[in-house]
């Protein structure tokens, strides 16, 4: 079988490939305008760590200024990204005391993003267990918390 117009065949093939690439690229979402640029620091107790895709979740209880316990969610890297830097389900366990720093959602809900300019300190060992730069390349330089708590 002879191809009548190779330009049409090439253009069709290129269109299919570009369409597939655009579909893949659109699978992720932006968060422009969703989070405060100011860094929020919280100290609390781990309730659960969910190493899942597309974003892992750290759930922790934090005491507010009035002494009431507020349940916070912290969203960060996917399970594969965390595994590459040595994370397992044992890295943070229920009951661990942590200090986290990240960008809070603008709505004021108890939700924080740890994907960039973020850190997690495990207070028992005063260990810096997560910096967003470990995966994404930025390297926040926040001081370590007072681990004598």
What does each of the following model-derived ranges do?
Residues 75-84:
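Short, structured beta-strand/loop micro-motifs enriched in basic residues and often containing a Trp
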Residues 52-63:
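Short aromatic-glycine-enriched beta-strand elements
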Residues 135-149:
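Glycine- and charge-enriched low-complexity intrinsically disordered segments
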Residues 84-100:
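Short nucleic-acid-contacting surface segments enriched for D/E, G, S/T with interspersed K/R
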Residues 10-22:
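Bacterial N-terminal signal peptides
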Residues 105-135:
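OB-fold/S1-family single-stranded nucleic acid-binding modules
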Residues 25-40:
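Short boundary/loop segments of OB/S1/cold-shock single-stranded nucleic-acid-binding domains
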């Amino acid at each position: 079988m002879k191809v009548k117009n190779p330009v049409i065949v090439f253009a069709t093939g290129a269109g299919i490939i570009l369409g597939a690439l655009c579909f893949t690229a659109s699978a992720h979402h932006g968060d422009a305008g969703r989070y405060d640029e100011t860094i929020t620091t919280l100290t609390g107790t781990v309730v659960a760590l969910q190493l899942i895709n597309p974003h892992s979740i750290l759930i922790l209880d934090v005491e507010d200024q009035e002494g009431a316990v507020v349940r916070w969610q912290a969203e960060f890297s996917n399970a594969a990204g965390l595994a590459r830097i040595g994370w397992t389900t044992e890295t943070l366990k229920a009951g661990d005391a942590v200090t986290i720093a990240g960008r809070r959602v603008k709505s004021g809900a108890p939700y924080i993003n740890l994907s960039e300019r973020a850190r997690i300190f495990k207070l028992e060992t005063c260990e810096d267990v997560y910096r967003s730069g470990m995966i994404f390349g930025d390297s926040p330089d926040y001081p370590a918390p007072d681990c004598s708590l």
